[in-house]
């Protein structure tokens, strides 16, 4: 007597919902996660195939799944500044008759990396000050922008060189004088540094302080 296996067990994903953080710096063809499923049947009744059946716009361009293993991979590199997350439904199906299947929802959160330098909103600034301006007066404001998010987009300002005559407030970019008089400084050139907290440095605009 030969006992044949009948297709009486559905394939089952380990989880109904997968939420995965994906670093935007991962290169094309990187493996993201294996979507493991089990089927207790034997032979073709337990042979599984994985497909993406429902997806957000853009998923097809970026995400693929290996049919025989369920491993998700990148078709091309992600960019957190363009896409913040991708959601899809993955189906696993056996090869029996009738075919049995299961589905799982997958959400990929794109994690920002520090790939944008801060940029000042102007190449140079000119601020006019009176000769005997009071110490710690606000003489002007500089601003910078950064395309990254979270901590990677937080900007800290510092003064690169000015002989100790000025300081700059964070995170406002307000520039202040530290001494009462500018008598011997008909023109002072100050360079500001705008690095992000995580270390990428921006450009240094010139700031001309003209006494009147």
What residue spans do the PLM features occupy?
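Extracellular cadherin-type adhesion modules in metazoan precursor proteins
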Residues: 1-212
